[in-house]
Amino acid sequence: MNSGIRVLRDRAAPVALAAVLALAPTAGARGQEAPQLNLYGVSGLIDMPSALSQPDGRVSATASHFSGITRGTLTFQITPRLEGSFRYAGLADLNYSGYRDYYDRSFDLAFRLLDEGRVLPAVKLGLQDFAGTGLFSGEYLVATKTLTPSLRVTAGLGWGRLGSYGDIGAPFGARPAANVGRGGKPSPGQWFRGPAAPFGGVEWLVNDRLTLTAEYSSDAYDLETGGSGASAILDRKSPLNFGASYRLGKRATIGGYYMYGSAVGVSLSLVADPYDPPVAGSTGPAPLPVLERPARSGGGAYDTGWTARAGVAESYTAQLAGLLKDHGLAMESLTLTGTTAELRLRNRRYDATAQAIGRAARAMTQILPASVETFRIVPSIDGLAASAVTLRRSDLEALEHAPDGAARLLERAQIGDAGRVPAAAMLAPDGFPSFTWQLGPYVSTSYFDPDSPLRARLGLELSARYEPRPGLVFAGALRKKLAGNLDSSRRFNTSALPPVRSNAALYAREGDPDVENLYAAYYFRPGDNLYGRVTAGYLERMFGGVSAEVLWKPVDSRLAFGAEVNMVRQRAYGDLFGFRDYDVLNGHVSAYYEFGNGFLGQVDVGRYLAGDVGATFTLDREFRNGWKLGAFATFTDASAAAFGEGSFDKGIRLEVPLSWFTGTPSRTSAATTIRPVSRDGGARLKVPGRLYESVRGYHRQVLEDQWGRVWR
């Protein structure tokens, strides 16, 4: 729920992601009950999977190594039953497919079909490496049963790689030959076909930290033992593996293993749980109390004669603006009548919009005269009035300390469209023009280059933002490299498409310092339920031009539609303000839908930066505390051959609010996107301040989800 939240995508996101996994404890009971992660980084035994699942929403990172085989895996428990993983593996000295050291990327999906009961085991169906090169491709059906509190057994049947040793035949027919091509495409015709082989194992939970495991593996490791012309890097003498894993407190697990009768293996797993932040509760300044008015029989406190006295309304405006500022809120305007007040404000501190609404309402009770009964609070982002929350002052007074006060206040609140600024609105003193600047570190990363799993650059970024009036923004950022190897990549454009993203290394090599962006933006409301944006300038590191967008999003609706058109030219590699000779007209029409339970869907159809036409499908899961994880895939008229390695654009993304780390309210979050490979097909323009995410957090669905924090 990051509307208007400052998202640090490539500036500090990689550091924050590492911190999420390294610093975040998991809940004691949840952590002890969670199954161990295997060497593939998924819930399992040692090298084989199990039917158990991680706690809902958990993010896990696992690094493992044995016999020249190194794997790094990010695993997401997408729902209580669905687990997804992205893996990057390196096989040293394999001498395969023209590479001495061979690197491979893969995706896994696993779905728990059956929960464990008193008699029946848990049952899971899984696809391993279902959309990669197929090097680790396999499928499985596995069951796990807890026999005693300290003893679990697992048995399963594997196909593909997991059916390559000790098979019992091919119950569903022969497995078609793999047609990997450029990789990156699922091959459903192969799934659960070919030889099937049993696997299994036993886990002994010695105590709440130590687990001993023994397993029988159905993976023959044909390639790693010298098959298909590769060098033998593993001597597979036995199908048996033995291991011990040990929990280091609540956030990490280490493991040691004896693999296949010949090799020693090690692993390290780090986990983070969105339901259990490092800091329990919420820190920061306490909210103001609701100031109760005197009884109506107590004199003239409710008289509205103050409205006729010169300067009184202006005095209330100045006092309220100062009090709001002390609590991280910025007034844009205040409109007063004898009985109503409309406050337009910017939320500069609270990641939960409902908390900002509650703090503003409390401040209004402190300042405004007793005759003002109706508070209409209009949150604004970039000058866009996003919604209007109307509260009765008497409800605030009556429900502040009620056990179910938040729920009852929500029942009585009205949430609707903001409408236009009233003609009698008084602008906040010192509100505009507004100028802010910041100097700080940034980290840019490149993940999973086939020649190197991680490249990074550390530097300083100077950013500034000037707003002469609501809705008009001038902003920019300048970067200077301090250290890193982001410019060492030698992989450049090899596809048939224009190099709109694949030449990123040239920008890193020749652009130092570089203007990350420099633009002007105008935000406006063309009508009820409508939002508009026009942005012009150097929009991102690789492109500059003009972008225009309109969004239809009623406050009460789960559904939204948007349209965006961009006319852009590619920026020069090393010239701060120059351009290259490639320009493109691109844009999309978009549909957004909030399914409920935190799931958000988005479909974008249109023309991409390389001129290809198609659609992007995105599904995110958002937690009430602001965590968001999701996946996307783009399909265009660019063929797999034209796209190059990976066949089509796809990836996963994770966003974590800073407040989750600190317990202190903050509008900043860290986000990172992981693609198996970055190519030119399906590439979209990166425009600051797109409308949907800017306004959605102030609409009914998000406000209701967060309303429990209205009194905090």
Model regions and ranges:
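Bacterial N-terminal signal peptides that target proteins for export
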Residues: 2-16
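Outer-membrane beta-barrel translocator/channel fold
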Residues: 89-108, 112, 124-142, 146, ...
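Residue-level detector of the transmembrane beta-barrel scaffold of outer-membrane proteins
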Residues: 60-62, 73, 83-85, 122-126, ...
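Short loop/turn motifs that connect adjacent beta-strands in outer-membrane beta-barrel proteins
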Residues: 30, 51-56, 114-123, 134, ...
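Membrane-embedded beta-strand positions in outer-membrane beta-barrel channels/transporters
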Residues: 47, 60, 71, 106-108, ...
